[in-house]
Curated annotation (Swiss-Prot):
The lineage of its organism: Eukaryota, Fungi, Dikarya, Ascomycota, Saccharomycotina. This is Translation factor GUF1, mitochondrial. Residues 1-21 form a transit peptide. Promotes mitochondrial protein synthesis. May act as a fidelity factor of the translation reaction, by catalyzing a one-codon backward translocation of tRNAs on improperly translocated ribosomes. Binds to mitochondrial ribosomes in a GTP-dependent manner. The gene is GUF1. The keyword GTP-binding applies. It comes from Candida glabrata (strain ATCC 2001 / BCRC 20586 / JCM 3761 / NBRC 0622 / NRRL Y-65 / CBS 138) (Yeast). It catalyses: GTP + H2O = GDP + phosphate + H(+). It holds the Pfam family GTP_EFTU_D2.
Amino acid sequence: MLKTLGLRSLCPSLGGRGFRRHPNINKYTLSLVRVRWNHHLSNAEIQARIENIPQENYRNFSIVAHVDHGKSTLSDRLLEITGVIDKNSSNKQVLDKLEVERERGITIKAQTCTMFYHDKRNGEDYLLHLVDTPGHVDFRGEVSRSYASCGGALLLVDASQGVQAQTVANFYLAYSMGLKLIPVVNKIDLNVADVERAKAEIEDNFELPRDEIIGVSAKTGLNVKEMLLPTIVDRIPPPTGNKKKPFRALLVDSWYDSYLGVILLVNIVDGKLKKGEKVLCAHTNKKYEVKELGIMYPDRVPTGSLVVGQVGYVVLGMKDSSDAHVGDTLMHVGKESVTDILPGFEEQKPMVYVGAFPSTGTEFKAMDDDINRLVLNDRSVTLERETSNALGQGWRLGFLGSLHASVFRERLEKEYGSKLIITQPTVPYMVRMTDGTESIITNPDDFPDSATRRMKVEELLEPFVEATITLPQEFLGNVIKLCDANRGQQKEITYLNTRGQVVLKYHLPLAHLVDDFFGKLKAASKGYASLDYEDIGYRESDVVKLELLVNGQSIDALARVLHRTEVEKVGREWVQKFKEYVKSQLFEVVIQARAGTKIVARQTIKARRKDVLARLHASDVSRRKKLLEKQKEGKKQMRSVGRVQINQEAYQAFLKR
């Protein structure tokens, strides 16, 4: 298969003689290579064509939409129509390069692609740069970074679903960054499509003129070539940088390649960059020589230079991914005094933390390498080593949300074959001490005990979010009950006149949001509700640490921080569930749930009894009593010194949802 695709000559990393399978190549990658390298221009022709296009004919744009409204499908059609890839029924999610993206049908990592468009109206060529961004709220950092290199965006709305929560959130993000927005109604070919209603919602919610809205079908390509592409050229402004100014570029993204090291995705704000020139990274003050640079088409195509207004990749021979700070400014060495540093991006903070441990202790070293390798390509994950008395050596991982954590785990299992035991997700709590100092607790094991709380802690605070929920009016009662049951505080309720839709705004504890709130919301609304949220800071809360004790010994990996009103219910569920996975011992096993100093629930596993009277004669009463007393004393001693044997499978089963 590799020979027929001609990959050996095109990609030496796949091997020549003595070929072996590369660890980063899977069936999805091979199919993508086959699709992407199907364009008809050589590298020299691509470079020559770019050089003949003036800066005023550049258009950098993104696609703004809710999850599953057709961003990736529209990207595929644009790539086909502009000739980047051939028309092929297998062209699905071409820019979604991760296996987990294709399986889940979502975009996780923002991807970019340059396209050539020939406008028959004036006979001119245009250089279009598309960013396919994620729609889920967990990956909003990817979205905001992508918008920074764009002059405009397509506001995409599903004709059958209308405006949803994340459509609104991403619209305001794009609007606040000054992007020119082109409203587009997608899926107009569906039988259930209500195009006029979708247009009315766009007009009402975003105050965009109805006559500017374009109806398309990303699946069939209807109106994409005839209406959408000319509109992109007409309405989205070209980049405003100056070619004569000293070179400077904004570092938008980075990823790690085992052969080239760290590859940077940059937006050229001013000037020009050529291969062989020396550049300085402002954040680290480190200097590098440009080894290779070019555009994504949609894979790397070396062009020898990048000029103002272009978005492309740069290879500097950088080996440590921590040196690539997203939002950093790149400039020519020696031009530091005449080059202004760009504002950059606000660094995203993790909102969810989990403990991760190998399913068997012997796998720690190999899995440590796998996790570090994956973190290289996802800079939003924080990583620290931690040790558990119950589960041994592991890691404390920080994520942007529960979907982000789930995707990371799935990538680790699918791409590296690594199996993890993941603890319950926890959120960062703030502890304010009596002496005025503050600290953030991300591990329940570090939560202050009862004595410390009495003597040194002024107050405990937990993070809250403002959740925006869009749903049909018929499910309003169910969703309000769900929010109230999760300690929510209703702030606003808006009825959308167009089609019986309601927008709810609630203040919710982040801890409840990451505890499968989205799944519960889908169940309460039969899948029709959509959710968006934003951080609104910390609030004082009566939270306590709930521990699971086995014969008086706390199992640190299972501890959780909960509101005091929830500990009894959760504690009873815990001890009942954990009892199922602990095998009976030769002595009595007591399983307890403890909140602070109070035991809130208990279960007992009776001792496994050995028949010491089996060989006795029935009439030997004194001997019988003596043996039973001896057994009783032995069990008493065993209970005081014996350790309960709990295997890893028990923890894994207990933590599994």
